[in-house]
């Protein structure tokens, strides 16, 4: 692996899940967040004891938002962007690193390609493939 870059310390804040108002009371109200827009809404008026609304203070630092723990920008998520990765973004001065997303099925093919030459390709050796065990009948 490539040594870590010098960067601002990466601080991962506690991630809060914001639930929709009264989604715990009714099945017909989904839990995904919606901003309350009613004129009398307690959540919109930020009363004590109500659920929290998303705001800018929950965000992380802009300089370190999408950095990997080694300080590189992750940019590769599919096999299509691999051709650009081999040519332009894998030079030694570029702060980018190829990070293969977890659900990418062509992970092994990407990892064995020439773009892996700079050894800045993360999540390449981990494979969730487990052979199925046959039942003895």
Curated annotation (Swiss-Prot):
Membrane-crossing residue ranges in chain numbering: none
SMART domains reported for this sequence: Ribosomal_L32e (SM01393)
Membrane as UniProt keyword: no
Example GO biological process: translation
Keywords of the record: Ribonucleoprotein, Ribosomal protein
Annotated region (Disordered), positions in chain: 95-137
Pfam families: Ribosomal_L32e
GO cellular component: cytosolic large ribosomal subunit
InterPro entries: Ribosomal_eL32 (IPR001515), Ribosomal_eL32_CS (IPR018263), Ribosomal_eL32_sf (IPR036351)
One example GO MF annotation: structural constituent of ribosome
Annotated Basic residues bias: 123-137
Protein family: Belongs to the eukaryotic ribosomal protein eL32 family.
Name of this chain's protein: Large ribosomal subunit protein eL32
Organism this protein belongs to: Trichoderma harzianum (Hypocrea lixii)
Gene designation per UniProt: rpl32
